[in-house]
């Protein structure tokens, strides 16, 4: 009987973990925080976020573009993105996030020529970079 209680607690924890991941997916977080929908054909390669009770801190999500998808008219339409160099603040954000999470598929610092789009909302920042050579999007978030 005493063994039953720890087993039930472990099972409850596992259920809460999987239900939480289903409810609070990366895509739902981008929609809730930034109003961005992730189109079909973008495959999440990596995702990192700081553990935080309030959801603040750094996040990094890397998406790979699958063959023959149209991104026209979406947030990820790199034809509408800026090609100018990165600002010092943007480079600092990339360095901070990269140093914190050490992603396997991270972008080179300083990044080679990339397409970029930045959104600022509620004091937070979302920096989206598209690397045409890698055919990947890198989303750097700083939630305050």
Placement of each model-derived feature along the sequence:
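N-terminal export/targeting and maturation segments
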Residues: 13-82
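Intrinsically disordered, low-complexity segments enriched in proline/serine/threonine
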Residues: 8, 41, 112-113
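Hydrophobic membrane-insertion alpha-helices, especially the h-region
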Residues: 1-19
């Amino acid at each position: 009987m005493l063994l039953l209680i720890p087993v039930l607690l472990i099972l409850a924890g596992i259920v809460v973990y999987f239900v939480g991941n289903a409810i609070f997916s990366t895509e739902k977080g981008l929609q809730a925080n930034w109003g961005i929908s992730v189109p079909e054909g973008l495959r999440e390669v990596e995702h990192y976020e700081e553990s935080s009770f309030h959801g603040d801190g750094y996040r990094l999500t890397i998406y790979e573009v699958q063959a023959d998808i149209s991104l026209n008219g979406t947030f990820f339409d790199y034809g509408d993105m800026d090609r100018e160099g990165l600002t010092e603040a943007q480079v600092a954000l990339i360095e901070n996030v990269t140093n914190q999470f050490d992603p396997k598929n991270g972008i080179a610092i300083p990044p080679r020529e990339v397409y970029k789009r930045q959104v600022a909302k509620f004091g937070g920042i979302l920096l989206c970079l598209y690397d045409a050579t890698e055919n990947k999007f890198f989303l750097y978030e700083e939630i305050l």
